[in-house]
């Protein structure tokens, strides 16, 4: 969704060619001793006297490298000390030596505009003006972005190539246009730099200047023959860039020079869509004055009004409706109106405005959901109350028979649930699967919602179409608190569904020992558990409470005379084996069970650990020690647990970090050590608590540090480094954060001052070149992975080859964009599949079925799972051995499963249960080159697995950025939770 996010690049590779990390000056404070060889320090400070004394009176070489392979000449060139540069050249310093990024001293001097140093290096040092760094960036690239016109002119006169391209295909003119220096632009064009040059993404210098808001450069480029309407690979024009970034002058110039005000990118997005999404009323008005059409729709059917309403831009919506009131009920491709979007996001003022403009309050989208369903699903009680007060029927149903109360109960929105009940919602209304709101709340373990419903009179023993009660669902889900509530309100302990199973059967089958105990103590009939479940009991209860198990076995032996001898022998052997277990082995088994319980439900796991004596008492220090000393524990579960805000969890977090030793560690080393102990949770507040404690511990352990004024600076920088790490090493992020952006993002964090530049630049280099490896446990669905690796897959409708991360697990082949992703792009069940090696394509095999289409599904661009349009899949490996290995593994997993349709439906319902909103995202352009900061904003995107900082990138329209990561999560208010409940009992 949303092609508009990638019009210009955030310098993934360009940055490393155009800017270089400043060499550390070593002495961060006047009283501190240099941490690097003093020859580098004296070179960087321009202290020619001490530098000459050192080199003349010692065996120190003028080419002595530091840890980044930078010599004194690099440092002197960067800091602009012509005297030191001249002296070092006299001492025969190598002027062509390169640092770890491939930069010569000339690149350093050029990036800072030190003309005298440039002249010395070229004329005295003999450096080639076209020398290239590791990304093919030349000194002219560096000077064009940051330096003065005099430096550019000197390099050009020295035969610097004005058409040189980086590995991203960018010329010096691209950089000068992004930097906004019209004199540099004119010099480069005069030197025959192509004014319409395109980089690897078809981005031109005009794209760069427009996005950065450099109207003088835009004017000059157009005057020199730049095409006014070039398109990048996403169909994005300079006008899109200027509009999304909010530059009126650039917009006006482009339109005056002939650009179509209603130009569209490959997804039908116009400049007006951008300004409305961003809430820029001034530019919205100007675009309309220039002829922009307010009723144009993108490929998702969304109008500018949809964009403005989704983000709550009230003034923009009022202006659009003033011009055309008939837009109020325009529907997008999913039949959603602006009121659906505003209600979904809980934008009370926007909902009120749209209702005042006569929006249809009961209008339904393609899933039969009304705005009230949307508001209820996300728990926006104020919006729900307003909609009801304005006439929305409280018991209106969607296409699956669900009312707004079903939605609130399913998603655990207790406040909204209470609001709907007070407004007259019916408690016993059933959806198409016979489920009541209480079924929904019980299925997802929302005990607070269950309590509210039961106190208001909901039938605790209501049955759905499968005759399952809420207690069946809660027991199968392992929701102990909910089970307690249901029993408290007199739920039938031994109710049987149509399968003849009681809640206890499901608790045992799912290994929910705590729930099983609650049911047994409440009087559950043990005879309802089949004899085969003795093994399940042992697995469920571990090795404790043997008497309970023996009672079950003995009772069954006396009452069931048809038990065969083998079963009796097995039970007797199991009993004898348990009696012979040594105490240590029992403890090991307990620990294993405790770990499994914790990995499934962290809080219940801790209760299990305490209740069964794994630790002596519920003491924060003991719990923290347990979490740190058992490697089998899920790092994700540890992160979720210690990140919770409850008092005890906070105490555990503090005890957990207190066990970690950061004494004498560099900042990045300490952070790496910390992040190896758990997996960062997705919720921002949890991360905040964890980083705050890390900052405190690191600062206390390093009282002699000369970098940080207080622990607040450590805290902010820790966040920033995590974002940088994700940005630098996530293959999905093509526009990487530059060093200049990293420094700019962290300016003033040290009690109002900047952290030392050499420290920050060195830190940037460490993170970019050496990824912080964060522990992860993998997707829950992929815990038993048979095979995984990179393969190349051919698309369905569009026959392109794309690299994907494949996982073979549970008779399914799943593929992801990256190994870090939580949700697969597609699922290929290996049911009745044939594997054939394709002799026409190298190392390629084909998956196909005797049916017309394979029973596979893929993740749509809006986050929903849909039927894939594949008669066959073509997949290529890197070599013959790898292909043979995959083919053999896949063949061994092919099976026949008549229930696949139900499985696919279950997965689709689950995805929709997370929700889907019908609007298409717009993301602002990302600046290609880091230069003097244009008036952009920095948006932080957090992901379950990743945190990303991008320049000028707003949240997606139509999606909600998840707190973990890098990918937007969309929501639907019209899932079928009871269908999910049914499959949960299978």
Curated annotation (Swiss-Prot):
SUPFAM superfamilies: Ankyrin repeat (SSF48403), PH domain-like (SSF50729), Sec7 domain (SSF48425)
GO molecular function, one term: guanyl-nucleotide exchange factor activity
Coiled-coil ranges per UniProt: none
Protein origin, superkingdom: Eukaryota
Domain PH: 784-895
Keywords: ANK repeat, Repeat
GO cellular component terms listed in the entry, alphabetical order: cytosol; lysosome
Keyword NAD part of the UniProt annotation: no
Domain SEC7: 580-770
Cross-referenced PANTHER family: ANKYRIN REPEAT CONTAINING (PTHR24173), ANKYRIN REPEAT DOMAIN-CONTAINING PROTEIN 16 (PTHR24173:SF74)
Gene Ontology biological-process annotations: actin cytoskeleton organization; cell-substrate adhesion; chemotaxis; chemotaxis to cAMP; culmination involved in sorocarp development; regulation of ARF protein signal transduction
One Pfam family matching this protein: PH
InterPro entries per the UniProt record, alphabetical: Ankyrin_rpt, Ankyrin_rpt-contain_sf, PH-like_dom_sf, PH_domain, Sec7_C_sf, Sec7_dom, Sec7_dom_sf
UniProt repeat feature ANK, residue ranges: 34-63, 68-97, 101-131, 135-164, 168-197, 201-230, 234-263, 267-296, 300-329, 334-363, 367-396, 400-429, 433-462, 466-495, 499-528
This protein's name: Ankyrin repeat, PH and SEC7 domain containing protein secG
CDD domains for this protein: PH_GRP1-like, Sec7
Compositionally biased residues, Low complexity: 1-28, 936-953, 963-986
Ranges where the record places region Disordered: 1-43, 911-986
Compositional bias of kind Polar residues: 29-43, 920-929
């Amino acid at each position: 969704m949303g092609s508009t996010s990638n019009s210009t690049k955030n310098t993934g590779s360009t940055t490393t060619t155009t800017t270089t990390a400043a060499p550390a000056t070593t002495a961060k404070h006047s009283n501190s001793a240099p941490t690097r060889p003093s020859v580098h320090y004296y070179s960087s400070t321009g202290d020619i006297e001490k530098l000459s004394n050192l080199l003349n009176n010692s065996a120190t070489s003028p080419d002595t490298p530091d840890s980044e392979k930078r010599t004194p000449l690099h440092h002197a060139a960067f800091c602009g000390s012509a005297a030191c540069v001249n002296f070092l050249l006299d001492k025969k310093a190598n002027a062509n030596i390169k640092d770890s990024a491939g930069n010569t001293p000339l690149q350093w001097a050029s990036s800072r505009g030190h003309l005298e140093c440039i002249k010395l290096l070229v004329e005295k040092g003999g450096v080639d003006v076209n020398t290239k760094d590791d990304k093919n960036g030349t000194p002219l690239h560096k000077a064009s972005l940051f330096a003065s016109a005099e430096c550019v002119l000197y390099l050009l006169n020295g035969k610097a190539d004005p058409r040189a391209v980086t590995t991203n295909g960018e010329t010096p003119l691209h950089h000068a246009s992004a930097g906004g220096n019209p004199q540099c632009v004119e010099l480069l064009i005069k030197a025959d730099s192509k004014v319409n040059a395109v980089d690897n993404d078809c981005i031109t210098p005009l794209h760069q200047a427009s996005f950065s808001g450099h109207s003088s450069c835009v004017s000059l480029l157009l005057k020199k023959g730049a095409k006014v309407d070039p398109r990048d690979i996403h169909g994005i024009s300079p006008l899109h860039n200027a509009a999304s970034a909010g530059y009126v002058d650039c917009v006006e110039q482009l339109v005056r020079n002939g650009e179509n005000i209603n130009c569209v990118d490959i997804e039908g997005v116009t400049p007006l869509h951008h300004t409305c999404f961003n809430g820029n009323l001034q530019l919205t008005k100007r675009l309309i004055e220039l002829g922009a059409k307010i009723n144009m729709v993108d490929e998702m059917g969304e109008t500018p009004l949809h964009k403005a309403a989704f983000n709550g831009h009230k003034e923009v919506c009022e202006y659009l409706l003033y011009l055309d009131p008939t837009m109020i009920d325009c529907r997008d491709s999913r039949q959603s109106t602006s009121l659906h979007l505003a209600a979904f996001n809980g934008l009370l003022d926007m909902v009120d405005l749209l209702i005042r403009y006569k929006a249809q309050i009961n209008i339904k989208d393609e899933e039969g959901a009304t705005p009230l369903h949307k508001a209820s699903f996300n728990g926006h009680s104020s919006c729900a109350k307003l909609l009801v007060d304005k006439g929305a029927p409280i018991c209106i149903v969607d296409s699956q028979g669900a009312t707004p109360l079903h939605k609130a109960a399913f998603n655990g929105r207790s406040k909204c649930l209470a609001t709907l009940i007070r407004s007259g919602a019916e408690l016993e209304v059933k959806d198409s699967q016979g489920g009541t709101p209480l079924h929904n709340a019980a299925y997802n373990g929302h005990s607070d919602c269950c309590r509210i419903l039961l106190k208001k009179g909901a039938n605790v023993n209501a049955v759905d179409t499968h005759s399952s009660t809420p207690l069946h669902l809660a027991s199968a889900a392992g929701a102990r608190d909910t089970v307690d509530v249901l029993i408290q309100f007199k739920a039938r302990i031994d109710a049987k569904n149509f399968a003849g199973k009681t809640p206890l059967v499901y608790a045992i089958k799912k290994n929910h020992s705590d729930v099983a105990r609650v049911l047994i103590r409440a009087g559950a009939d043990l005879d309802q558990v089949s004899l085969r479940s003795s093994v399940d009991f042992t697995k469920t209860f571990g090795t404790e409470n043997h008497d309970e198990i023996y009672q079950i076995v003995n009772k069954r032996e006396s009452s069931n005379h048809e038990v065969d001898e083998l079963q009796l022998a097995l039970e007797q052997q199991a009993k004898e084996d348990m009696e012979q277990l040594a105490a240590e082995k029992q403890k090991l088994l307990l620990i294993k069970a405790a770990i499994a319980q914790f990995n499934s439900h962290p809080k219940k796991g801790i209760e299990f650990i305490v209740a069964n004596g794994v630790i002596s008492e519920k003491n924060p220090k003991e719990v923290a020690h347990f979490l740190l000393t058992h490697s089998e524990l899920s790092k994700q579960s540890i992160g979720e647990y210690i990140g919770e805000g409850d008092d005890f969890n906070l105490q555990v977090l503090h005890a957990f970090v207190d066990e970690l030793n950061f004494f004498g560690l560099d900042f990045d080393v300490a952070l790496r050590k910390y992040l190896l102990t758990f997996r960062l949770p997705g919720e921002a507040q949890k991360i905040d608590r964890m980083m705050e404690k890390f900052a405190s511990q690191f600062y206390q352990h390093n009282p002699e540090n000369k970098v940080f004024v207080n622990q607040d600076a450590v805290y902010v920088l820790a966040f920033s480094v995590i974002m940088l790490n994700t940005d630098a090493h996530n293959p999905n992020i093509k526009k990487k954060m530059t060093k200049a952006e990293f420094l700019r993002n962290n300016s003033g964090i040290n009690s109002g001052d900047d952290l030392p530049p050499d420290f920050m630049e060195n830190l940037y280099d460490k993170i970019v070149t050496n990824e912080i490896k964060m522990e992860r446990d993998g997707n829950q669905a992929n815990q038993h992975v048979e095979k995984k690796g990179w393969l190349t897959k051919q698309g369905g409708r569009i026959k392109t080859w794309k690299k994907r991360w494949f996982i073979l697990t549970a008779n399914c082949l799943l593929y992801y964009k990256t190994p870090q992703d939580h949700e697969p792009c597609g699922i290929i069940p290996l049911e009745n599949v044939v594997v054939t090696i394709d002799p026409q394509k190298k190392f390629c095999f084909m998956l196909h079925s005797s049916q017309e289409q394979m029973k596979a599904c893929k993740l749509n661009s809006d986050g929903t799972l849909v039927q894939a349009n594949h008669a066959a899949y073509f997949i290529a490996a890197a070599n013959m051995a790898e292909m043979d290995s995959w083919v053999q593994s896949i063949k061994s997993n092919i099976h026949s499963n008549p229930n696949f349709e139900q499985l696919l439906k279950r997965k689709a319902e689950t995805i929709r249960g997370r929700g889907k909103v019908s609007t298409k995202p717009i993301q602002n352009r990302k600046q290609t080159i880091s230069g003097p900061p244009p008036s952009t904003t920095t948006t932080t995107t957090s992901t379950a697995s990743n945190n990303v900082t991008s320049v000028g990138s707003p949240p997606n329209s139509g999606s909600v950025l998840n707190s973990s990561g890098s990918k937007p999560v969309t929501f639907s208010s019209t899932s079928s939770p009871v269908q999910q409940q049914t499959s949960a009992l299978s």
